[in-house]
Amino acid sequence: MGKPIVAIVGRPNVGKSTLFNKLAGKRISIVQDTPGVTRDRVYAEAEWLNYNFTMIDTGGIEPTNDDIIMKQMRRQANIAIETADVIVFIVDGKEGLTAADQEVANMLRKSKKPVVLVVNKIDSLKYEENSWEFYNLGIGDPITISASQALGLGDMLDRVVEHFDRFDADAEEDEYIRIAMIGKPNVGKSSLINKLLGEERLIVSDVAGTTRDAIDSYLETEQGKFILIDTAGLRRKSKVKEEIERYSVIRTYASIEKADVCILMIDAQDGVTEQDEKIIGYAHELNKAIIVLVNKWDLVEKDDKTMEKFKKDLQGSLKFMPYAEYLFISALTGQRTHKILELAKKCYNNYNKRVSTGILNDVISKAILMKEPPIVSLKRMKIYYATQVATKPPKFVFFVNDASASHFSYERYLENQLRNSFDFKGTGIQIEYRQRKE
């Protein structure tokens, strides 16, 4: 199961972006910021009280009249309801309760999702009583904060993480391999999922997933148990194109967060687009298992060298993830679709692989004998030993004399040695240096 997702919801100018940027400013143990496809800051990886989670800023276009504000608030609340596990609902303590606040509160109550009500702009104790009227929303006790002054944020996050304990109960789904199908509209994701579901006799059930538009399909095959996280419902007709694009990004990123294996489907006639690179780049940053699926291969004029040349071109465009697996298919005709789940299982096994410490250090010792670390700033890093500390993704910690003497080229060399020795094809891996005395 992926990390819990926390969405920040509220009408324009209540302080959503201020709060998000305060969190993303590394003032509360933020681990990593990830820009969205639209280059807006959509996601921030966060940690609080040893809980890791993902914050979403559901802000976007700020409407100019009341009718559009209400429509925007409904759409924003829907996005939060669809993608989030916990919702932070921000209201303006200085302006007071509004009709838009009431409408969103009604939607959030019906969602059955945990909601943390936050009254912002309470910059001093004299404004505390301003929060009382928000009890009328009927969604629990309000937490008062000042996002701009970073007051009350700890209490707010304490309330948020209280809802995370229920995620420990998701162990039943751990035996399923979670696959996110990602890619631009019209590339064939829906056709492929229907093909996979139609070919497999042992479908367990289709259940509503984390999004209303998408369906998470549970199925069992000879290869194993799978959950297909369908992002086919990303498209929605709207006059406000940029707004919907942003929400599509949020849905897609939420799918990546929850997945073990990310399958990027591209159109053989279009190749890799800039949007494809950014979306799969996020999966790469999270070190997910990755497959690039080239669809509509039946429409390409080809000879016996076309596929290899096409693959090399793709690898050139996606050179930041040389470990990715590639498969050329036709969702329409079924060409090679029977290989998809088999390849996904292989990538997942590598994503979940654990290496014994003894064998690992034998490999590292030989690697150092073949090529010792370079001198960096008059210092040479000495590696004492290494150990694997996690799976999904595989994470290796190297204990060294001086982590500041590390060099990216040598880290790449060590990664290649690990990949060559233990077959991590199809998955990202992590390497971390920890300093210790000899």
Swiss-Prot record:
Q: Which gene encodes it?
A: der
**Residues that coordinate or bind GTP 1:** 10-17, 57-61, 120-123
**KH-like domain mapped to chain residues:** 353-437
Q: Which GO terms describe its biological process?
A: ribosome biogenesis
> What does the UniProt function comment say about this protein?
GTPase that plays an essential role in the late steps of ribosome biogenesis.
Q: Any idea where the EngA-type G domain is?
A: 4-168, 177-352
**Gene3D superfamilies under this entry?**
3.30.300.20, P-loop containing nucleotide triphosphate hydrolases
> What family does the database annotate?
Belongs to the TRAFAC class TrmE-Era-EngA-EngB-Septin-like GTPase superfamily. EngA (Der) GTPase family.
Has UniProt tagged this entry with the keyword Repeat? yes
Protein name per Swiss-Prot or TrEMBL? GTPase Der
Q: Where does GTP 2 bind?
A: 183-190, 230-234, 295-298
Q: Which domain of life is it from?
A: Bacteria
